[in-house]
Amino acid sequence: MDPYYPFDALDVWEHRRFIVADSRSFITPEFPRDFWMLPVFNIPRETAAERAAVLQAQRTAAAAALENAALQAAELPVDIERRIRPIEQQVHHIADALEALETAAAAAEEADAARDAEARGEGAADGAAPSPTAGPAAAEMEVQIVRNDPPLRYDTNLPVDLLHMVYAGRGAAGSSGVVFGTWYRTIQERTIADFPLTTRSADFRDGRMSKTFMTALVLSLQSCGRLYVGQRHYSAFECAVLCLYLLYRTTHESSPDRDRAPVAFGDLLARLPRYLARLAAVIGDESGRPQYRYRDDKLPKAQFAAAGGRYEHGALATHVVIATLVRHGVLPAAPGDVPRDTSTRVNPDDVAHRDDVNRAAAAFLARGHNLFLWEDQTLLRATANTITALAVLRRLLANGNVYADRLDNRLQLGMLIPGAVPAEAIARGASGLDSGAIKSGDNNLEALCVNYVLPLYQADPTVELTQLFPGLAALCLDAQAGRPLASTRRVVDMSSGARQAALVRLTALELINRTRTNTTPVGEIINAHDALGIQYEQGPGLLAQQARIGLASNTKRFATFNVGSDYDLLYFLCLGFIPQYLSVA
């Protein structure tokens, strides 16, 4: 018997072990006999009511799916626009970058044409009269900054063309004997220290003021008020002039010149000083101290343009210029302030949404495009900044005396242009105590608008205020440095231009791109420009809130820009610099 098998009767031994198969060898629990009778294996047949319920559930699910699909389809245009807008912005960035490169190429060509500028100066010395066949295009390139000076004719950019003449006039000494003030010297030294690559494209040897650097700096000053993101049919300067005229028209209905109302945009530019005076009077009549600031907590931190064309609600309404324009009906109510379904008692005939600026643009500019500033709040923000800067410009030029002693002027056109000062002209006017008796009012600004602003606008209708007055842009960028400290302690400022980091960066990028085969990415240039634009935006507000901003009360500050008289101030505002020659012997 094999001890491993309990069924010994089935064990057969024939020289091998062999176990016979038997049912008793299969050990398993007893299978339930009624297992296949359970209900789960015997489903009753579906009734008609149950089939109807299933069909109804299917129809309900299909209707819900169609409704969800309709909602998603309604959101598709918004989603598509949200995805396409960054692509459009990149395309605009590329177009603006190409335009900037074309401008840089034009500036480089002008730098190569310095000998031609010197030859033109020699031709003027020979007394060559202008050709009588000169057309209107040549007349548009002539401007007059000071009334007792002859007009200036330029090629493409007045400050850049004059810079070439300044360095060419120094002769053999080159840039070693040309200075512009400590402010420019500080910016140049900061640029060299922070961006050493700029030394490849500019000549900074022996501490000289580089002509290439000054050209790039002036172009940066001119660009800080421009909008490079987006495509617009109207400039911020045009919008500012239209708003000022509408405010004057609304608040000064008994004006003596109502019978001879302006018929063209040039008439508005000629009367710009009286519009600015009216703005100052309207703001002065308001109670409290005016606030020239936006809601910083509702604005993008490092971006000037508004995403989708609009900032957060209430971001711009705190600025006194915008509040004044809305209060007097020049601008309609801000989006969301007066809903469309408001009672007719609150908003009769939908007056709160009428936009007179759009109508004025059609009347004076007639470009076939609507102008609704609340729909493009980036342009509205730039417009308010332009109006504030114009108000500052009026205060800077108020009661200026350009007939004072000529030897007090740092800028002498006679050292650049032979015969610039006629021999019969009076070399000395009222100065010292006598100059205080002169009250010129807005005469200098009126002459500047007619003889300088209007020709430049006619030559380029897209021009912005900072392109017209780069010196004003420099003052606005330097406004924070000129703020008085609350403490009475005497502090010596050794910051070496740290406040102008944005200007230094943009100028350095302009210089570096001249020697690079792979230029700086467009996004980096836009970021640098936005940082400079945001800093410039704060300047007009700070200057507008100061009681005294003129030359008489800020001589030390203006001395850093090489400005020593009202005559210098006029040229500085228009050129962005005042050159002075030094002996290098």
Swiss-Prot record:
It comes from the Viruses. InterPro entries: Herpes_UL25 (IPR002493). GO terms for biological process: symbiont entry into host cell; viral genome packaging; viral penetration into host nucleus. It is found in: Virion; Host nucleus. Residues 109-138 are annotated as: Disordered. Residues 112-123 have a biased composition (Basic and acidic residues). Coiled coil: none annotated. Its main location: virion. One of its GO terms (cellular component) is host cell. The keyword Phosphoprotein does not apply. Residues 125-138 have a biased composition (Low complexity). Keywords: Capsid protein, Host nucleus, Host-virus interaction, Viral genome packaging, Viral penetration into host nucleus, Viral release from host cell, Virion, Virus entry into host cell. Heterodimerizes with CVC1. Interacts with major capsid protein/MCP and triplex capsid protein 1/TRX1 at the pentamer vertices. Interacts with the large tegument protein/LTP. Belongs to the herpesviridae CVC2 protein family. This is Capsid vertex component 2. It comes from Human herpesvirus 2 (strain HG52) (HHV-2). The gene is CVC2.
